[in-house]
Amino acid sequence: MEQDKPFNHRPSSSAREARLVAASADEAMVGLGLRMHRFAPGDCLGDVPRLRREVYFHERGQFGDRSKRVTDGLDACGTTLAVEKGTQAIATLRLHDFAPLAVQVEYGSLFQIDAFARSWPLAQVAVGTRFAVQADQRSKPVVDRLMEEAYRWAQESRIQFCLLACEPFLHDVFEHYGFREYLPPAILPGGVDLLRMVLVIEDEPFLSECGSPLHRLIRDPARALPAKAWLTRSFNALS
């Protein structure tokens, strides 16, 4: 606790509002027969590998050694989110910060993480991967809940930037939540484009402008100001 600030046992209005929003979202999930599951690093992922396999391979008609391709070593050090219906996972996203060397090795070049490392602790820069939503569950309430839980994880972890890479057909989905491209697309072998996008946590003006469902979760808009200014200078990404 900072010594020059008196202790206030009453939670701030923004914190109280965030808890009320979370409770409301939880009630809505229950009404839909859904629940949110956060798998901590090292936890068994339950039904998540099946969902990944279904989306990544069955939908695309790709088969082969699926067991190795739907899980990897980074599952053990990441936080995996899942929206569940009954015993089935219907939407999932994996989250890491960039402090672990394995995450830097796997994703650092793609996201130009060295530029972030010169100005920010890598524990404040996160990446979202392994996004998958079951085909018959691709509705706004399901994806909203997944992204809201990811945002809460970022707030709890004191993340400043959340990065992700997606194919162009998902651009509008992530833009709706407040992500923007900050680098030109990466071209993968085979000519596949990957859009490199960033969400500045607590960026109140932009989340309001784009109508992001995450706007109501903002607790401390001032935290975004230096992060947004730095990103603009470093990548000419934001206006």
Pin down the residues of each PLM region:
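Short acidic N-proximal helix/loop "leader" segments that mark the beginning
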Residues: M1-G31
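Acyltransferase donor/substrate-recognition loop-hinge adjacent to the catalytic core
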Residues: R16-S24, F116-S119, D203-E209
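Short amphipathic alpha-helix that is part of the acyltransferase structural core
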Residues: V21-D75, T79-E84, A89
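Sequence-level motif detector for i,i+2 pairs with an aromatic at +2
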Residues: G31-L34, G78, I90, A123, ...
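Conserved GNAT-family N-acetyltransferase fold
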Residues: L81, L93, F131
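Short, His- and charge-rich active-site/binding loops that engage polyanionic ligands
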Residues: K85-A117
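Acyl-donor binding region in acyl/amide transferases
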Residues: E106-V200, P205
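Acidic/histidine-enriched, glycine/proline-rich intrinsically disordered or flexible terminal extensions
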Residues: P205-S239
